[in-house]
Amino acid sequence: FLISIPYSASIGGTATLTGTA
């Protein structure tokens, strides 16, 4: 999960990070 945060943020950006959270 912790790895998925920066990983997704690098691809989708803030939108993905907010969606995952």
Swiss-Prot record:
Compartments it resides in: Secreted
Signal peptide: none
Family note: Belongs to the frog skin active peptide (FSAP) family. Phylloseptin subfamily.
Keywords: Amidation, Amphibian defense peptide, Secreted
Coiled-coil regions listed: none
Cellular component, GO, one term: extracellular region
Presence of keyword Secreted: yes
Protein name: Phylloseptin Bu-1
Residues carrying Alanine amide: A21
Keyword Transmembrane helix: no
GO-annotated biological processes: defense response
Principal location: secreted
Tissue: Expressed by the parotoid glands.
